[in-house]
């Protein structure tokens, strides 16, 4: 009789413990549905309070040339696949072409598609997953065609941002630090084009975002209402780069100020050989930072911009999943 009671008691404890475990780890499963992970968050959160995985030079997946790929290819998945894998920050860089279009570039290298390709894919994705938000960084990355008569920003504003085909796609609210509820189904602009007449998104002021080259830096944006904290030391070697990434992660972890915007680049410029290619750097940096994020648990990371987003090396944690699951 005593044995039966003991067995019953242990069974009850196991059931209770199991229920507690699954309840306590419910939010760990965000990355199990990467295509709509934002839909499971409190939509009262500001975007700056959400840990967001991003891709660096997001459009470089089109490169096939093996020589150019060593230093210019930073992604191997197309836009829609990146979105489905959980990426929500896209680093789009371009060049103004003679036909008043923006060609997507990585530096001098043309990536064989136009900005409209990204916007069309984002529009399609957000219509399928209307509770998600995409942050799009926009930057001029190469000199305009000699026949261009408008500035890069003017072309973007007139032919894309204000284009009836895309206008409802962009967040156009006045909140400098919008919530997820305000931006669902929208692209929020992260403006690296310089001075602008666009009054919504990050960098929405006359001076734009003042970006320091190859540096960890802080600057005020949106007429001083937000503090942008960036690590973009792309000329570092592995050890120094990892240290720089971890240093900004440590600051974000203990910072509860929603008006601080953390943008942390994991990318390193290639040295031009397979040994120090973007892929090789990513194969070491991504798993190392993923391990750190996992060890930190539910803690603020900010927005982490990575090479080869959605690519998992055998035996290592996937960095996109770890960023998603670190959300509280």
Curated annotation (Swiss-Prot):
Protein localization: Secreted
Transmembrane annotation, as ranges: none
Residue numbers annotated as active site: 56, 106
Pfam families: PI-PLC-X (PF00388)
EC number: 4.6.1.13
Catalyzed reactions: a 1,2-diacyl-sn-glycero-3-phospho-(1D-myo-inositol) = 1D-myo-inositol 1,2-cyclic phosphate + a 1,2-diacyl-sn-glycerol
Protein name per UniProt: 1-phosphatidylinositol phosphodiesterase
Source organism of this protein record: Staphylococcus aureus (strain NCTC 8325 / PS 47)
Upper taxonomic lineage: Bacteria, Bacillati, Bacillota, Bacilli, Bacillales
Gene name tied to this protein: plc
